[in-house]
């Protein structure tokens, strides 16, 4: 068996542009203050709840998505959504000039929302240190607005945010300015970002993250072949099935009717595949969090022959339509805003879409995520080749063997320790029916991505 190295490129780019119709005439300043207050309270309340119970949020979101699109593939980033909403609430707060912090029912000294971001900020900083993550917040604010400069300085310091004042009334100039600034900050990885813009925009938040990971060993291209994937009892499709054999975390439960494998990546990140038994997929979705936790508890390192389909799927989430189905009490809706505003005034418009795409092949797993008003950005990112050392747990009687893998002259040889016990029979995990996938940060056990693959042939 050859021991190649698999480049796992998880390129994550998520962008949010919050577009709000604002009122600037003297008679309506009081109404605008109340609208911003409602926006801040509701968005920050939701982001705090998402941060406090991340896996519960992911499961609730899954349930809502399944109800809305039961026969579709799903991929999304719970962490991206949490960070986006929390950061957006900071931007809204910066546009409020009040001499009574107690009116906000938030910590008057600093940013109450910020403490809920700390675990995510810490995750980001650690991955940046390991050179597998790059990220930045860019906040564009209408220069005609009166803003809280002290608060903006705090946001810039704590979040490392780049703050730009801009004139949104000249739409074409504003679009070019934003797109050019973002392209410059991302080294032209993101170009022509803004295609549509409202002249009454007060805030435009851009949050971009590029994440790269490396799996220890690649699938073997020469072993890929066509096989049947059972979408359901009535539907089956022919797909390219990849293969590789290696030691990985494995768990199997007859009681839970599910199998799970977990593969480590560089940067304390892992890729987990959860395969429900035939006929148990819908049940597993309803109890996803509990079953996953139980399977992890009983997992151990085993020699596994993994057979997995090549796939490319994408999915779009509309914040405005979906989030009220998860928690109507804390979601920003037109009804909720109108009830909180005493005087008649146009309602602020909040549009945000979350669209993600995932592609899995023999040599790379690429995840692109974009949060934007109306467009999906596809940013191909090549992962740097990093020498890998694969340590495989062995039995007492096994003798380690050193396998030298041919590489470029400038690269350091890869040392792979493999078991020499030829009598060991690998456990076969054949993913030929709907399954779940998770890309997780190991230190915090936070999900960077969550996905449901129903049909690998359908994008």
From Swiss-Prot:
GO BP: any one term: female pregnancy
Which superkingdom heads the taxonomic lineage of this protein's source? Eukaryota
* Glycosylated position list: 268
GO CC terms for this protein?
extracellular space
Signal sequence interval, chain numbering: 1-25
> Where are the residues marked Reactive bond as a site?
420-421
Does the UniProt entry include the keyword Glycosyltransferase? no
Tell me which PANTHER family the record gives.
SERINE PROTEASE INHIBITOR, SERPIN, UTEROFERRIN-ASSOCIATED PROTEIN
The record's comment on protein family reads: Belongs to the serpin family. UTMP subfamily.
Name listed for the protein in its UniProt record: Uterine milk protein
User: Which lineage ranks, top first, belong to the organism behind this chain?
Assistant: Eukaryota, Metazoa, Chordata, Craniata, Vertebrata
